[in-house]
């Protein structure tokens, strides 16, 4: 396969590990070891990387790529983002699940349809998925990816609709922020999937 036409980021190469060309790699797959299941991975410039060995190491995997046999060659790859074509990813058909790559770049609208900004990243710091949104004329904000805060997602039409009160962008009519008792942790069965799901 050549350079992906519809790329989805699967990993980013970190620091060299040892002196024999191994690298620490942060994966965005549901199961980190599944990174090797996708065949060649591609850098933005089209270079292909074939995994010849992979093993777990704390929060990353240690990978050996074909043709990378010493520390100097490995160090030169630090920071390289690795992609596969979207067609290589499983489509589980779950209506309320999305790949991070599906959400990044979507326009953010309020309940009236007014454009507020764009999704620039998706994070999960351990408490649930969060959309990183840049708003027109304001600094970026973090919006919880919950049913209350983000009631509608339309990847096909290129937008997410947020409830400004539930998203914490404005106070409600009484001047109150959203109440803790209004929080329903099961309110959104969906959530951004890491690339590749649990393949």
UniProtKB/Swiss-Prot annotation:
Key word rRNA processing present: yes
Alphabetic keyword roster: Chaperone, Cytoplasm, Ribosome biogenesis, rRNA processing
Organism for this UniProt entry: Mesorhizobium japonicum (strain LMG 29417 / CECT 9101 / MAFF 303099)
BP GO annotations: ribosomal small subunit biogenesis; rRNA processing
Compositionally biased tracts (Basic and acidic residues): 176-193
Region of interest (Disordered), ranges: 167-199
Listed name of the protein: Ribosome maturation factor RimM
Biological role stated in the UniProt entry: An accessory protein needed during the final step in the assembly of 30S ribosomal subunit, possibly for assembly of the head region. Essential for efficient processing of 16S rRNA. May be needed both before and after RbfA during the maturation of 16S rRNA. It has affinity for free ribosomal 30S subunits but not for 70S ribosomes.
Family of this protein: Belongs to the RimM family.
Pfam families: PRC (PF05239), RimM (PF01782)
Domain PRC barrel: 95-168
UniProt GO MF annotations: ribosome binding
NCBIfam families (UniProt xref): 16S_RimM
GO CC list: cytoplasm; ribosome
Domain notes: The PRC barrel domain binds ribosomal protein uS19.
Subcellular location: Cytoplasm
Source domain of life: Bacteria
